[in-house]
């Protein structure tokens, strides 16, 4: 193992030292940021004095619950003041009032806390204080998480430097730096009782693993499928947390995870004779492309119609038109995704075209959902897909006289 890293790590001493120093600084930044955030969130609150009672109005736009929800959060607002009250679904159904009397308390360090009752306990004060501080310090936590993932990115490019070109390393690290910046500027809000910090962690992991997987595919490396398994696990977690994109979640469970394992085996059996790290790739015939397009259209209509008829609680509140649009876009994305998975399994160049379509459809969903950090991932998709398509095309052209490049009828 040590000999492997010695043979593949960055050969230029100056650059290698610089990358190690950057990794150490990122690690320190991550520890300091997360440590500071945890210290603030878990700080003991000695006392909280009552300030005043306030009438707050219920914000119904943030509500979309069904019997599947055991806990229903209702938000009340008054200017910039906010109170979130958790109800059981049974109590939520019978909740008719659009206003509530909130009680404002202030801690010894000036933090304002709001409750729906007086005579609060120390445990209630501590819990509310922790939630408020976690929301305030979300950019700090996001920076700490992103710095740690960025450190791993730098180390990968250092330890496997000889496996990547300068362009590939620059592309990979640029996307991760951009994701770090976006995660700090646009922190995620909580959803379905899950703190926005956890959601951002999933987004950053999804970005990191996806672009690494994309890069390995463009290099015709079978190891992309090992990374892809981690991608599927993260994306399933995202679907569960946000309660959305159910077509994608089912497709991931029943199709992508099995196809990743099978594809790894298949690619391992078709190594390039001259370069064992490469896998032999090829392309489709025209009529086969038409059949694929027809299949995608049929899948989109059938699956979209089926899921739109289900009574499922989503993270898009009460906007029925938006929910339906997301369902059909997601159905189309899942159809293209399945085609993409088969293209990758059969080592077909057309998988890059499928990547283009998937990236566009998912970018639309990300914009609608306000998932801005994932737009960085889509930017990475578009740029690397172009790179991968050109790279595979050159390989196919150079081997056209040696190997069959089209699937026989």
For each feature predicted by the language model, list its residue ranges.
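Cytosolic juxtamembrane N-terminal segments of multi-pass membrane proteins
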Residues: 1-15, 120-132
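Polytopic alpha-helical membrane-helix bundles and their juxtamembrane interface segments
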Residues: 4-44, 149, 153-220, 257-259, ...
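Structural detector for short beta-strands of small beta-barrel domains
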Residues: 45-66
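Acidic surface patches and DE-rich sequence motifs
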Residues: 62, 66, 76-78, 95, ...
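Short linear proline/tyrosine/threonine-rich motifs used for host-factor recruitment
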Residues: 74, 82-86, 103-107, 111-116
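Short nucleic-acid-contacting surface segments enriched for D/E, G, S/T with interspersed K/R
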Residues: 90-102
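Short, aromatic-rich amphipathic segments at membrane interfaces
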Residues: 107-143
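Hydrophobic/aromatic-rich structural module bridging two neighboring secondary-structure elements via a short loop
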Residues: 218-270
